[in-house]
Amino acid sequence: MAVPQTAVAPYQRLKDVDVVMTINHPREVIGLGNMLILNPTATLPSGLSDTLDNDERKDGILSRKTDSATGAVFREYSNLDAVAVDYDADTAVYKKANSYFAQSEHSDRVAVLDYDPAKAYESLEAFWTFNWTFAILAESKVDDSAITLTNIFEANKDHFMVLQSNDLKDFDKLFGLNYTIALKHDVAEPMDAAFVGAIANKEVGSTTWKFKELAGITPESLTTQELAGINNTHAIAYVRVSGHNRTSEGWTLSGEYIDSLHGILWVQTNIESSLEDSLQSNDKIPYDNEGISLLRAKVTQVLQEAHEREIIATDDETGRGVYTVTAAPKSSQTKQDISKRHYEGLSFTFETSSTVHSVTVHGTVDSDTILV
């Protein structure tokens, strides 16, 4: 019996700034392109030190951390040879890493999380804020455990789960998910790792996820009806069109486009970082118009950069970014918030930049033939 989609609470984070994002319809940060390979295993490595020795660093292992509560082990590798130190060439993890590093736009690292499948929630929680944003499964399958994982990603709204299956029906139970990406492809080829490696690490705002070539992945020969079914599911295939191998679309299972959600995540991450830096680098930020103006300026600065990166749309008449920033005065804050030195008067809106995915051209031909 399939595990139903259930609501779970997002993970707690150690921070002083909380940016709450709401997407209305219709209407380079480190780590935002990095990939984590999720490797559930019944036998976890034990006795590993969190401190790397010189030989391990020379081998290309970047970091290692064991969660004492769950036994889960998080490791980062700089290249495929480094992955081979811990995973043989015939393992699922190695094959996914191989596909990832085969892409020209891959990151400077790949991460692997070995965890007890019975402790998936707690294991991911321990390493949720580490240096990764996109996750794939070591063994591509859409089963009850995968559904449980998608619940976590949908609750937190700041990481993406990429699932792969050759059976389109596997994704029916996940239809409408915003932070889950479905790839319809033969699982003998690691399209998920190639997909992330080829696109995710490009500058946020600079690219769509459609039309992309994936090294080492074989395009499918699909009928019009088959491709229509994939599109209706909001899944993504790898096809050949006009002599080019390419990804068929660039959306999540909700139909929202990955580049838009990735851009929203960039804005959220950078506003949090900018405001957190202001709180920590200033001796104090006064709870008055001057301090509030400083906070407002920080948010405006991030949104302006997002516009320059083409994350935020441009007003056709003014040429400026379509965004607003509002900062309510101290007088509008509650006595409780003022007493706790908490300011909740900052808000902003923006329109995401769009991308051309298809073109219709209307032409007229003048003929010398007279039709009688």
Predicted regions and their residues:
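Surface-exposed assembly/interface segments
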Residues: 1-372
